[in-house]
Curated annotation (Swiss-Prot):
Keywords: Hydrolase, Metal-binding, Zinc. The gene is mshB. This is 1D-myo-inositol 2-acetamido-2-deoxy-alpha-D-glucopyranoside deacetylase. GO terms for biological process: mycothiol biosynthetic process. It comes from Corynebacterium kroppenstedtii (strain DSM 44385 / JCM 11950 / CIP 105744 / CCUG 35717). Its EC number is 3.5.1.103. It catalyses: 1D-myo-inositol 2-acetamido-2-deoxy-alpha-D-glucopyranoside + H2O = 1D-myo-inositol 2-amino-2-deoxy-alpha-D-glucopyranoside + acetate. The keyword Zinc applies. Catalyzes the deacetylation of 1D-myo-inositol 2-acetamido-2-deoxy-alpha-D-glucopyranoside (GlcNAc-Ins) in the mycothiol biosynthesis pathway. InterPro entries: GlcNAc_PI_deacetylase-related (IPR003737), LmbE-like_dom_sf (IPR024078), Mycothiol_biosynthesis_MshB (IPR017810). Its cofactor is Zn(2+).
Amino acid sequence: MAVHAHPDDEALWTGGLLAHLSRRGADVRVVTCTLGEQGEVIGEPMQGLIADEADMLGGFRYRELEDSLRILGVNGVHHRPCVLGGVGCWRDSGMVGTPSADHPRAFVKSGQQAVDALKALMSEFCPDIVVTYGPDGGYGHPDHIRAHEITHAAVAELPHTSAPELGGDNTDLFSAVLARRHGGRETSADHGIPDPVVLWAVRGETALKQAGRAISRIPDGWVAPSGMDFSFVDGAAGAVDSASSEKTPDKITEPDLAFVPDDLVDLAVQLSDADIEAQANAMAAHATQLWIADGRQSWTNPESAWAVSDPTVAPKVFALSNRIAQPLMREEHYVVAYGGSGPWAKTTPARYAYDSSVVRARGRSAFSLDQADEGAAHDTSEQSGQRR
């Protein structure tokens, strides 16, 4: 189960892992907490959907979410969105300090009701693994932080029956997921759920910077992220070294792209070409929010964009509405935050920070999911023909 704040987060933060596990036969559920009503819009045709005008962006993004879930192969055979509390229950709170956080349905005000709603979904689905963001929400968005809070609260409040064994090489973490559909476990809210492993989606510093340096040219009008030591080329403007001409080195306090130190990354999941393609297509389904620089167009955003990068390191380049160029990496990074049994178990939630008080997680361990689950008992998903 992946618990995400807005439509598009499932593809952007966890799309590679979700697509791969689905393709290999795991039952994958994405829970979306809001409809992203406060988002900006890429492309001129749909600008009128934003909250300050028609305020219809949430419904439009619901449809984009449907397409993304279908591409990733998750949320059952019909790939229907699972919106926490039901469609329209909670609203996008907007960025820090914006008036939208005062809306009576703002997700930051969801309280125990949101925890109870997530507990009900977990009791029904009985996940072995729960994926969300770290305590900072990945980049500080209030809804992402709230998703983290309710995820840990729900896991803590539900009764548990057992914990998946985590082997020293961490491959058993994903074997447990693939075995789940064959195990026939009977669980309920009364008897408890298997003690799930909680993962936080992050990006490790070295891999992100290496992928960024693999980009040699970005589209006209896009900008390079500040604080990352990248030097891209814009076909019209020449070298682009910063996300804003107003940002001089003495004004830059934080990088534009969020990352964590390498030693906080527990899992560096290597993605196949099929995983990357599924993730990129799922991201492109959110055309009002994400722009893939591979020439594709949509009726939402009819303007094409092209970037040049080393596909062995950064197979795609994308941007949000701010047009800051980012690499789509060949691996996804996760912190094992809580749960499980065996050598990798964590009985208290992990924490990460950028100061000496951080509770250090184990060092990075890269592996291929294809290799990790070769020969898994009853695993016939490679022959299932499931559509990507």
